[in-house]
Regions:
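Intrinsically disordered, low-complexity Ser/Thr- and acidic-rich flexible linkers and loops
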Residues: 90-93, 123-138, 233-239
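Conserved active-site neighborhood of the chymotrypsin/trypsin-like protease fold
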Residues: 108-126, 134, 139-207, 211-215, ...
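N-terminal targeting leaders that route proteins to membranes or the secretory/organellar pathways
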Residues: 1-74
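A conserved glycine-rich beta-strand in the N-terminal activation segment of trypsin-fold
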Residues: 63-69, 79, 86-107, 113, ...
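Active-site region of chymotrypsin-like
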Residues: 76-94, 176-190, 215-299
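Short, flexible surface segments
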Residues: 101, 107, 193, 199, ...
Length: 299
């Protein structure tokens, strides 16, 4: 009993940690702390599991969404700020008429909302271009462009719409690198399925509302269901979405400009795209990442 008491108190000092750094060793031991009370065999099995993860470079991805520093720095690499821009080649001027957020899902592709990727300048924007910028809207060479920026606030690139499902409000845009304008594409780790989610699960929202680059907030899942189920309380929802659209209502605060930004679970996997803010309740609504995956792999 004295040996067991010392083991539970001190852990196994004889594990082979190979070339792991001090921080990695501490993290391995921390992850296996609970298994110590079940004995040496259980503890050694846990150590082996997490040592392999550390050697494979995935250990620190295990719970990045809950670890403030590592989480934000890691997840930010896969999130982009999106600007919708009118480019007047005749006048050599640009006019930004909207912004949103997006998430990198492959080495070339970014998911966002269609109401971001397919936004059009409104009458106020066009009036400003005509009266204040002196654009000739009929004769000047003008093009609508999407620009993406990493959350480092430095690197910019063009992007083009390549796939859309407007009744799910999911669009996929493609990074269009040029010599001076390109970004490092670091995709999200994995998609988490809608069926794996439960009410009360931790979530983290990321985006750039109002041009506030890299805004993040946390909360938990409050409701899971389809647009058809939601229509009982929000009848107008079916005007914009298919009945089978999967929604996640959560407590991570989002704002105008958060649209298209990712919603992550506690493992740093994407579970949805933030899409709606309820007008009648303090609810933040994301469309399931299942719909991103369906569109990504569709023909």
């Amino acid at each position: 009993s004295e040996v067991r008491a010392n083991f539970i108190s001190d852990g196994n000092d004889y594990a082979n940690f190979g070339d792991l750094t001090k921080d990695q060793i501490e993290s391995v031991k921390w992850n296996c702390n609970r298994s110590r009370k079940y004995g040496l065999v259980a503890y050694n099995e846990c150590l082996e599991k997490f040592i392999n993860k550390a050697e494979g470079g995935t250990l620190f991805d295990e719970q990045i969404a809950k670890k403030p520093k590592n989480n934000i720095e890691k997840l930010e690499q896969s999130v982009v700020y999106i600007e919708m821009v009118l480019t007047n080649y005749t006048k050599k001027q640009e006019l930004t008429f909207g912004s949103g957020s997006g998430v990198i899902i492959s080495n070339k592709e970014i998911a966002t909302n269609c109401h971001v990727a397919m936004a059009e300048p409104d009458a106020k924007d066009l009036d400003f271009a005509k009266k204040d910028l002196k654009w000739n809207l009929k004769n000047d060479k003008i093009e609508e462009l999407l620009w993406i920026q990493l959350l480092n606030g430095k690197d910019w690139a063009e992007a083009k719409l390549i796939k859309k499902n407007e009744k799910k409000d999911i669009c996929i845009i493609k990074h269009n690198p040029k010599e001076l304008f390109k970004v490092a594409m670091k995709p999200i780790k994995e998609f988490s399925s809608f069926d794996s989610l439960k009410k009360g699960n931790f979530v983290r929202a990321m985006g750039s509302p109002g041009g506030l680059i890299g805004h993040t907030s946390t909360g938990d899942i409050q409701w899971l269901g389809t647009a058809e189920a939601m229509s009982r309380n929000f009848p107008n929802i079916l005007e914009g979405f298919d009945k089978d659209t999967k929604f996640i209502v959560h407590g991570a605060k989002i704002h105008s400009g958060s649209s298209g930004g990712p919603l992550f679970d506690d493992d740093g996997n994407i579970i949805g795209l933030n899409t709606l803010i309820s007008d009648t309740a303090a609810e933040n609504i994301a469309v399931s990442a299942d719909h991103i995956k369906d569109l990504l792999y569709s023909n």
